[in-house]
A protein has these predicted regions:
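Conserved alpha/beta core segments of nucleic-acid transaction machinery
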Residues: 142-173
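Helix-hairpin-helix
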Residues: 167-185
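Conserved AdoMet/S-adenosylmethionine-binding subsite of the radical SAM
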Residues: 1-139
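Short, contiguous strand/loop micro-motifs
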Residues: 67-68, 109-112, 160-164, 174-178
Length: 185
């Protein structure tokens, strides 16, 4: 039995997906995600009745998004990730910087290099949401819809919120200490 199941979202926005792959739609992605979630929840109910009942994908589900192929902002991507993490069985969202492999299809953008720093910043922001309880709007907002490629998202937040510092680590709550750049779990 599989430990985790993954359904690939591919492109974060339905309109962009239609632009690059008109034959695909997000419904064909979200429907299987729903089936997996239903299977996990039914399995959990069955285990309440029968302790040795087999677990269905015990590590939950994951998905992946390609970033940089279309014009979505990091804010759009992180809001989608946050919504996915709100599902009871979603454990991990992976981000993959777009790499042009088919240069003959005019629908696909021709980038000089993959957006690897952006991909890394999205992983850092994802970590802040999952383990540090940051909200999307604390990481990116309308005035800063994309992550700063020069500094990590936690430092960028700290620079935008000087009123939060200094922090007395002997008296501050754990959650506040975790927001200090350089301190982590």
């Amino acid at each position: 039995c599989a430990d985790r199941m993954s359904v690939i979202i591919e492109i974060p926005n339905e309109a962009s997906l239609k632009l690059l792959a008109p034959e695909k739609d997000h419904e064909s992605v979200y429907r299987p995600m729903g089936y997996i979630q239903q299977g996990v929840l039914e399995s959990a109910e069955e285990r309440k009745k029968h302790r040795h009942a087999p677990r269905f994908v015990p590590a939950g589900q994951s998905t992946q998004m390609i970033v940089g192929a279309t014009g979505e902002s990091d804010r759009d991507i992180l809001y989608l990730s946050s919504a996915l993490y709100g599902r009871p069985t979603m454990r991990r969202v992976y981000y993959s910087g777009y790499v042009a492999v088919n240069t003959y299809d005019p629908r696909l953008p021709a980038l000089k290099q993959p957006p690897l720093v952006r991909e890394n910043r999205l992983y850092q922001a994802d970590w802040l949401m999952r383990f540090y309880q940051f909200k999307v709007e604390e990481i990116v907002d309308e005035t800063h819809p994309d992550l700063d490629l020069e500094v990590d998202p936690k430092l960028a937040w700290a620079l935008r919120h000087p009123e939060q510092f200094p922090v007395d680590v002997n008296r501050a709550e754990y959650e506040r200490i975790l927001r200090v750049p350089g301190i982590g779990v």
